[in-house]
Amino acid sequence: MSADPSSSTSRTVAVIGAGPVGCLAAMAFAKRGWRVEIYEGRADLRLPESRANLALRSINLAISHRGIVALQAVNSAAADRFLADAIPMHGRMVHTTAGKEETIYYDRDHQHINSIDRAVLNQGLLDELFFRHKVQNIDFDGKKMTARDLETGRDVEAHFDLCIGADGSYSVVRRQMMRVMRMDFQQTYMKDEYMELRMPSGVGASGESTFLLHPNRLHIWPRHSFMLIALPNKDKTFTCTLFAPSTEFDKLDTVDKFLSWFEHHFPDAHRHIGADALAKDYSRNPRCPLICTTSNPYHYKDRAIILGDAAHAMVPFYGQGLNCGLEDVRVLSALLQAEGITSDKTSEDPTIVDPRLAHALAYYSEHRHEDLVAICDLAQNNYVEMRHDVTSPMFLFKKAVDNVLYMLSRRQRLSLASFGSALASVPFPAGEPSEWIPLYTMVTFRPDVSYATAQRKARRQARVLTVLGWLTASAVGAGSLLALVASYDRARRLLTR
């Protein structure tokens, strides 16, 4: 991936972690002329056995506008390839215990998120890596590190100008940074866990493979304290994920108990998956923890920075973990460009700090932190919406009102294509849209609106909805949509006094 591996005048970036975030970071720096080396402790993720192991505990990835724009900013051709392998999902399909299905669209314009297999995304980004090399120690001040070749057991030393930690929730790079700097860090395990299940494809009238559920929906079986979700795959199967409190899983300590419980709560999913397949998945697939981590700052001098889950692991209920991590890369790359940071070495002496690069990394830490805290909070809150609120008439009513106000106040529809070029060189979009925009639309389909801005705006809009509900109930009992819309300006004036 290096522009010129033999050149001694180009800076070297060592990327630790070969997941989507690490690989996109490597591509971004290679594009800017840096020498790139990627270190990954796992075996080659493109091998069949690696993909099989990944499938046992890997939630399918939902990539939306933020992630796509980040990919486009680095390599538009790669973004097009990934989208060709993705399946669009235009909304949630809610499954009741009575077998009824109802679609709740994400957006009044039927904009969609995309389901993509994690292995497919990784495979498309991987190129030149040191697989089976586990980082043992990092000397940031000396700009060198030791990695163990797990095949031979030998330690190898590598030198770098910048180290990027994209090595996940249990980041080695983050732990090494905490030895030499003051970093605030918090790790929280959720009371819930998850287990992967798989729904097979069906057989059509002519013997062809078919989807057993609507292929362009994210399927949800909300059951208040737990839920099942299913995302479509290109081979006509569905990757299902069961989320439940640890105490609920503890009760299901035999296959028979699990099958009986599953059939009672998810009868249609039980029918589609089948008892034998469910029993196999229950026995083979692990119960996995849900973890949330926060840290600050994200950098050390001019020589280290953490991105993605290494900096901010979040629960998967907003579908923004991948998108946020990829956006980290876009923001950092655009910031380095804006600061005029090039691939040219500034000194051969590792003790000398490059003030411009140090300032750029510090600026990233300071200005990215608010957004990362916001999306972690939003993701956690969205779990309640997915497993409980989507069954509530009040939720559906508020969503309808949200969309009406969005329609009435919107000035123009912004397409995905319009964001790519606009954000490629803008690390932190400024300002706040003046029109009414639902929270989900801002987070998922408006990469020009920061997470923190979306959260602040949504809180104000929620207060407006509360006042509208009160005014409508007072005026017309159950209320009519026209009366509610007519109350909009009055409610907004009340809130801004």
Predicted regions and their residues:
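Conserved N-terminal helical subregion
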Residues: 2-13, 58, 64-196, 255
